[in-house]
Curated annotation (Swiss-Prot):
Residues 1-31 form a transit peptide. Keywords: 4Fe-4S, Electron transport, Iron, Iron-sulfur, Metal-binding, Mitochondrion, NAD, Oxidoreductase, Respiratory chain, Transit peptide, Translocase, Transport, Ubiquinone. Complex I is composed of about 45 different subunits. This is a component of the iron-sulfur (IP) fragment of the enzyme. Residues 30-52 are annotated as: Disordered. One of its GO terms (biological process) is mitochondrial respiratory chain complex I assembly. Gene3D superfamilies: 3.40.50.12280. This is NADH dehydrogenase [ubiquinone] iron-sulfur protein 7, mitochondrial. It catalyses: a ubiquinone + NADH + 5 H(+)(in) = a ubiquinol + NAD(+) + 4 H(+)(out). Core subunit of the mitochondrial membrane respiratory chain NADH dehydrogenase (Complex I) that is believed to belong to the minimal assembly required for catalysis. Complex I functions in the transfer of electrons from NADH to the respiratory chain. The immediate electron acceptor for the enzyme is believed to be ubiquinone. It is found in: Mitochondrion. It comes from Solanum tuberosum. [4Fe-4S] cluster binds at residues 88-89, 153, 183. One of its GO terms (cellular component) is respiratory chain complex I. Its cofactor is [4Fe-4S] cluster.
Length: 213
């Protein structure tokens, strides 16, 4: 009898722990136990897709993307480069702007003012004395703006790489988008570089990035 009383007392002391353990779920609930407000059983709105930016719906994303495409079409079809000739590469740049290659058919019109340009073509050797002027002209260009480095001297110093007076690449002064190799590069190479810049402009998503910030 003493043994039975001891076991009954032990079970009485462990009853709260058994009740607490019974409330712990060790398996996933079945579909039949889901509440009526669950998206899986109700006709409410589904959760947003993982590919959609936060805070924007699919129709809004589509409209914003189309506006971005329209802006990119206008920008790549009306590139106005500013002539920044520094050495012999500038002669090839002038050759590219003449009637033989006819850059006007691509909407490319050379402008003498940085405030009317969106692309700067750095053609030639950039010296330490000219570097502040290059940066000042770049800062005067409106956004969005791009830079094309034309020739070996503008890309990395070229023939004068070890000179004390030459900047070893104009990308140390301004950010460069397109590099055109050659010493000097031909007019076809410059045209190819501008076509690559048009592809880069076409991939921009300015409005979508601004909207999702």
């Amino acid at each position: 009898m003493a043994l039975i009383a001891r076991n009954a007392k032990l079970l009485t002391g462990t009853a709260p722990f058994l009740q607490r353990a019974a409330t712990i779920h060790t398996t996933l609930p079945s579909l039949s136990q889901q509440p009526a407000s669950s998206p899986a059983t109700s006709g409410g709105a589904q959760p947003p897709s993982m590919n959609t930016p936060a805070g924007i719906s699919k129709p809004a994303e589509y409209v914003i993307s189309k506006v971005d495409d329209l802006m990119n079409w206008a920008r790549r079809g009306s590139i106005w480069p500013m002539t920044f000739g520094l050495a012999c590469c500038a002669v090839e740049m002038m050759h590219a702007g003449a009637a033989r290659y006819d850059f006007d058919r691509f909407g490319i019109i050379f402008r003498p003012s940085p405030r009317q340009s969106d692309v700067m073509i750095v053609a030639g050797t950039l010296t330490n004395k000219m570097a502040p002027a290059l940066r000042k002209v770049y800062d005067q260009m409106p956004e969005p703006r791009w830079v094309i480095s034309m020739g070996s001297c503008a890309n990395g110093g070229g023939y004068y790489h070890y000179s004390y007076a030459v900047v070893r690449g104009c990308d140390r002064i301004v950010p460069v988008d397109i590099y055109v190799p050659g010493c000097p590069p031909t007019a076809e190479a410059l045209l190819y570089g501008i076509l690559q810049l048009q592809k880069k402009i076409n991939r921009r998503k300015d409005l979508l990035m601004w909207w999702t910030q």
